[in-house]
Amino acid sequence: MNENMIECKNVVYKYEKAEEESKVAVDNVNLDIKKGEFLVVLGHNGSGKSTLSKHMNALLLPSEGTVYVSGMDTKDESNIWKIRNNAGMVFQNPDNQLVATIVEEDVAFGPENLGIAPDEIRSRVDEALKRVNMYEYRRYAPHLLSGGQKQRIAIAGILAMRPECIIFDEPTAMLDPSGRKEVVNTIKELNERYGITIILITHYMEEAVEADRIVVMDKGKIVMEGTPREIFSNVPLMKNIGLDVPQMTELAYELQNSGVNIASDILTIDEMVNALCQLK
């Protein structure tokens, strides 16, 4: 049995521009994502992370190389609907993904288009809204909700399609801190409680701390790969790429440089407090 949800094999993607040289946005990427994994892809603007993510449910097809989703080649047109049913996608702006005037109708939109029976749709909509803690808002108009609530409705709309994997392309970029926290908690729960494979594209380091594994992209290539502790403890390399690290990791780095004997892989405030309390 194939343990991988998504496999990228020597993937190259070129943006073809009229009268200009084509721009390589993804440059020979090899990446396997396991079923049930929570993977974060980090990178600054223009690193290729969003372009790569759009290959993971066949929104884009590679110029060279192959992408497999649940063992299906994205270049095979007969696989497209199965792939998009298996791997849902949530974008930055929830307003661009909401199509109905009532929350529960919006969540029902995807299953209706799959031709699913009304009783089954009702069941899926209720279940999806409960999973994102938005069931009590099912009869609200989406435009009356906060940004974080709208994004959770967009996630519910994907969940109603029963995907095995959800790709989040900077889903908190347009949200305030409280909305961001709501959405990140929802993403974590979908992974931990329901076993859904999560691929989160972000530039917020505090979100990346929650991942099983982090991939860092720069100039279309994967330049680092490892656990959050392995990635963030390498502060000079992250800074060199143009990325920040979590505040507590940066503080640990500065304390080390000042001669304080403290671990370099501290990620959270609690870990920092514990480390400082153990100093003599």
Swiss-Prot record:
<dbReference type="InterPro" id="IPR030947">
    <property type="entry name" value="EcfA_1"/>
</dbReference>
<feature type="domain" description="ABC transporter">
    <location>
        <begin position="6"/>
        <end position="244"/>
    </location>
</feature>
<dbReference type="GO" id="GO:0005524">
    <property type="term" value="F:ATP binding"/>
</dbReference>
<comment type="subunit">
    <text>Forms a stable energy-coupling factor (ECF) transporter complex composed of 2 membrane-embedded substrate-binding proteins (S component), 2 ATP-binding proteins (A component) and 2 transmembrane proteins (T component).</text>
</comment>
<keyword id="KW-1278">Translocase</keyword>
<dbReference type="InterPro" id="IPR050095">
    <property type="entry name" value="ECF_ABC_transporter_ATP-bd"/>
</dbReference>
<dbReference type="InterPro" id="IPR003593">
    <property type="entry name" value="AAA+_ATPase"/>
</dbReference>
<keyword id="KW-0547">Nucleotide-binding</keyword>
<keyword id="KW-0472">Membrane</keyword>
<keyword id="KW-0067">ATP-binding</keyword>
<dbReference type="GO" id="GO:0042626">
    <property type="term" value="F:ATPase-coupled transmembrane transporter activity"/>
</dbReference>
<protein>
    <recommendedName>
        <fullName>Energy-coupling factor transporter ATP-binding protein EcfA1</fullName>
        <ecNumber>7.-.-.-</ecNumber>
    </recommendedName>
</protein>
<dbReference type="Pfam" id="PF00005">
    <property type="entry name" value="ABC_tran"/>
</dbReference>
<keyword id="KW-1003">Cell membrane</keyword>
<dbReference type="InterPro" id="IPR017871">
    <property type="entry name" value="ABC_transporter-like_CS"/>
</dbReference>
<keyword id="KW-0813">Transport</keyword>
<comment type="function">
    <text>ATP-binding (A) component of a common energy-coupling factor (ECF) ABC-transporter complex. Unlike classic ABC transporters this ECF transporter provides the energy necessary to transport a number of different substrates.</text>
</comment>
<dbReference type="InterPro" id="IPR015856">
    <property type="entry name" value="ABC_transpr_CbiO/EcfA_su"/>
</dbReference>
<dbReference type="GO" id="GO:0016887">
    <property type="term" value="F:ATP hydrolysis activity"/>
</dbReference>
<dbReference type="GO" id="GO:0043190">
    <property type="term" value="C:ATP-binding cassette (ABC) transporter complex"/>
</dbReference>
<dbReference type="InterPro" id="IPR027417">
    <property type="entry name" value="P-loop_NTPase"/>
</dbReference>
<comment type="similarity">
    <text>Belongs to the ABC transporter superfamily. Energy-coupling factor EcfA family.</text>
</comment>
<dbReference type="InterPro" id="IPR003439">
    <property type="entry name" value="ABC_transporter-like_ATP-bd"/>
</dbReference>
<feature type="binding site">
    <location>
        <begin position="43"/>
        <end position="50"/>
    </location>
    <ligand>
        <name>ATP</name>
    </ligand>
</feature>
